[in-house]
Amino acid sequence: MKDGVVLKANFFIPQYMKTFKCIGPNCIDTCCAGWDINIDENTFNKYENDKGKLKELITGKYLKNSESDDSFNYGFMKITEDSKCPFLNKNLLCEIHGKCGEENLSITCRRYPRVFNIIDNIYEKSGLPSCEEICSKAFLNKEKMEFIEIEEEFDEDSIEIRRVIDSEAFIDSDNLIQYFWDIRVISINIMQNRNFSIEERLSILKAFYKNLESLKNEENFYAIEDLLEQITENPSNITEFIDYSTVVPVSITTNFFNIILDENLLSKVIGTRLKIFLSDLNKDQNLLNNIYEYHLKSLDTYFNQYSYIFENYLVNQIFKDIIPFNTGEDLNQSINQLINTYKLIKSYLILWNISSQNEISEKNIIYVIQALSKDLEHSKVFKDILTHNL
C-alpha cells in the first residue's frame, strides 16, 4: 500500500459528526484499553524503516500479523498484561501521538471512533458508541437525528471502508438490496415515530422485515414495491400496512437476566468499565431473586422519559451498520441482533437500579451504552446473546 493523495468528496453523515472532535485528556475513558489494536501495512512499514525517535519508542512493542493478508490488519500492538496498549502512559494518553505526532498512528488509532461506508459511490461517516463523546453528541439531543451532506478532504488510503454496497447492481434481481434506500429510510422513520414506544417501534420494524422476506420468498416483487411505495407516501400511518401483532412483542424474560449475569460471561469481558460494572452486579447474591419481586413496570416512566436516547442510539446503529443488510440477506437475524442489543442495555440499567438504587438517568444510560459497546464492537463475548431469539 502506498501513501494516497488527498481527495475531496461529499460525505453523507449524521449531523452530530459535523461537530465531533476527540476531547483527548478530558475523556473519562481511554479508547484503546482492553482492545486488540491492529496496524495497517503503511504504518507497519513506517515503524520498520524508521531510524529515529519513533523507532526507539516502538521497538519490541508490535508484531506482524502472520494470520492475515489484509493490509488493514498487517500487524498489531503487543498488549500488556493488564490489557492495555503498550503506548498508553500513566495519564492514559498515547505516547506515539504525544512524542511523534498523529501522522505516525495506525489508521485504526487515527480514525477511531469514525466508521466509513460507501453506498452507491457515496461516502458515509458515522460514530461508534464505544466513544463517550460520540454518545453525548449523538444521543443526548432530544430532537430526531438528522442527516446531512458535506464536502471533506481525505486521504483514500488512510481510511478503512467497513462496508461497500452497490444497490444499483442488483436492480431486477431477487435480492432485496436493490431497494436499499427505501428500506433504510423507512427503517429510520419507524425508529423515529414517537407515536409508539421503543419496544413497539422495534416490533414494527421486525414485522416490516418479516413482510419483505415473505414477499421475496414468494418472488412477489410487485407487492414489495407496492408496500414500499405505500409506506413512503404515508409514513405516519405505518400500521395500516404493517401488522406488528404477528411478531412476538419485545420483552425481557427472567431467562435473559439469568444469561447476562452468568459468571462465565463476566470472565470473558474485555472492557475495563464493563468488567467493573458486571463485577459489582455479581456481588449482589440476591439480585436475581429481587428481580422476580421487583415491579419492573415501575421503571417504564423513566425509560419513556429518556426514550430519545434509545431512539438516537438505534437510529445510529441502523445507519452505521447498514441494517438490515449487515448479516447478508437474513433480515430477521439483523433485526434480532438490534433488538437484543437494546435488551442488553435496558436489562443492565434495570439490574443496576435494583442492585444499588442507581437512578435511570441520562448519565447512567450513556455509561451503560458506552461500556457495553466496547465489548459489542471488539469481542465476541456477547455473540450468542445477540444472534439468538431469547
PLM regions: where:
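Generic alpha-helix detector with strongest preference for long hydrophobic helices that associate
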Residues: D3, F12-I13, I28, C32, ...
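Charged, amphipathic alpha-helical linkers/stalks
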Residues: E133-E229
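Hydrophobic, aromatic-lined core segments that form the binding pocket/scaffold
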Residues: N195-L390
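N-terminal cysteine/histidine-rich coordination modules
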Residues: M1-L92, I96-S106, R110-D155
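Short, mixed-charge, low-aromatic patches
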Residues: M1-A9, E160-V164, K297-N304
